[in-house]
């Protein structure tokens, strides 16, 4: 990330990057190293909790919520931080030098990565299990987790994880550009609205909702089970996209945006966090870490890839760049995404029947 920042800094504010390929390579490399840490942190947390005799369903969510708190803090910071002519400031007013629009966001990401790197040395040790028998190459690479696909329940779980990963990628990739696109509206009230000029701050409501919903997971999992909890997530995605489709940044349309951000907490947590707990409970100790990696691969790997490609085709068909904003028939796009989430939810309800445990 610091490399991406340096390339942007060298090019100068508002200038085109001279070497786009190097920028993409550095960014992709950074993301490639980051993505496995999601599964790794889940596995580490579950291991430490169990080593200390704690309940993962009850005690993991309050820990996980701190990650969301950090997410919110950085969203607010990047939304408001400005670096202009060597002077740092914070503002809610529209400013082209805000970190959210410039290479400075990569600088923040790089510095935080170094801080987290150092923090990892303070974590409790998670000892590896030593096996008396010779470990195969498949086991060493963690590929033995793929045997979970032999079980119908886990195979369906991972398939639907990928489908929900597509939904997550849609909102990750297009929520911000969609809201910001209203700055190019012919309606002055919409173009100058607070929401259109502070998309990152507005969407942080999603993370606030996420933080609150994480704390509800223990109750819902124990009361209703994984199937109902995941169904709540799937239908929350329907509302997430649907509210975007009917809203706009000005009053009263912005209320729809706020509602979309609120239901995001259920859409994300009741699948991603609950799914991680479900995988930990269902898998044997020897493959728990690999299974978490497989879960992340299905959601943030396969699901995200197909989600990016499919959503890109849809958005490119209905929208186009005009005056620096991605404008067009966004309503149709969001309704298509909502329909997809609805089909996934109904299909999941019909085919996924997890075993009930006493």
Q: Can you say where each PLM-predicted feature lies in the sequence?
A:
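C-terminal ends and interior cores of transmembrane alpha-helices
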Residues: 1-17, 235-250
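Multi-pass alpha-helical transporter architecture, strongest
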Residues: 8-11, 112-125, 332-358
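Intracellular juxtamembrane helix-capping segments at the cytosolic ends
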Residues: 35-53, 270-284
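A membrane-interface helix-boundary motif in multi-pass transporters
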Residues: 80-111, 313-341
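Helix-to-loop junctions at the C-terminal end of transmembrane segments
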Residues: 82, 212-226, 315-316
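Juxtamembrane intracellular "pre-TM" segments in multi-pass secondary transporters
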Residues: 123-157, 184-186, 191
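Short amphipathic helix-loop junctions that connect adjacent transmembrane helices
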Residues: 173-197
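C-terminal transmembrane helical hairpin of 12-TM major facilitator-type secondary transporters
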Residues: 227-275
């Amino acid at each position: 990330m610091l490399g991406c920042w340096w390339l942007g800094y060298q090019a100068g504010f508002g200038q085109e990057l001279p070497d786009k390929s190097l920028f993409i390579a550095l960014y992709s490399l950074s993301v490639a190293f980051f993505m496995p840490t999601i599964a790794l942190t889940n596995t580490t947390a579950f291991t430490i909790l169990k080593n200390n005799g704690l309940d993962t369903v009850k005690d993991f969510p309050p820990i996980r919520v701190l990650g969301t708190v950090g997410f919110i803090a950085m969203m607010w910071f990047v939304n408001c931080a400005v670096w202009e002519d060597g002077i740092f400031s914070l503002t809610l007013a529209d400013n082209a030098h805000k970190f959210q629009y410039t290479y400075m966001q990569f600088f923040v990401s790089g510095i935080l990565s170094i801080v987290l790197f150092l923090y990892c040395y303070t974590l409790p040790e998670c000892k590896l299990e030593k096996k008396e028998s010779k470990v195969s190459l498949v086991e060493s690479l963690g590929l033995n987790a793929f045997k979970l696909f032999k079980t119908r329940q886990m195979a369906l779980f991972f398939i639907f994880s990928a489908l929900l990963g597509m939904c997550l990628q849609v909102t990750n990739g297009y929520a911000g550009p969609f809201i910001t696109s209203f700055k190019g509206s012919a309606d002055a009230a919409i173009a100058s609205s607070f929401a259109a000029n502070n998309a990152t701050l507005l969407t942080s409501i999603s993370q606030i909702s996420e933080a609150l919903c994480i704390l509800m997971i223990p109750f819902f999992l124990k009361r209703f089970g994984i199937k109902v909890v995941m169904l709540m997530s799937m239908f929350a995605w329907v509302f997430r996209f649907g509210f975007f489709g009917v809203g706009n940044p000005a009053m009263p349309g912005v209320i729809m945006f706020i509602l979309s951000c609120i239901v995001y907490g259920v859409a994300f947590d009741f699948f991603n966090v609950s799914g991680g707990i479900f995988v930990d409970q269902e898998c044997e100790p020897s493959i728990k870490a690999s299974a978490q990696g497989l879960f992340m691969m299905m959601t943030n790997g396969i699901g995200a890839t197909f989600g990016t490609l499919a959503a890109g085709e849809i958005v490119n068909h209905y929208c186009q760049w005009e005056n620096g904003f991605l404008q067009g028939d966004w309503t149709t796009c969001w309704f298509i995404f909502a329909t997809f989430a609805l089909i996934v939810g109904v299909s999941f309800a019909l085919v996924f029947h997890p075993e009930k445990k006493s």
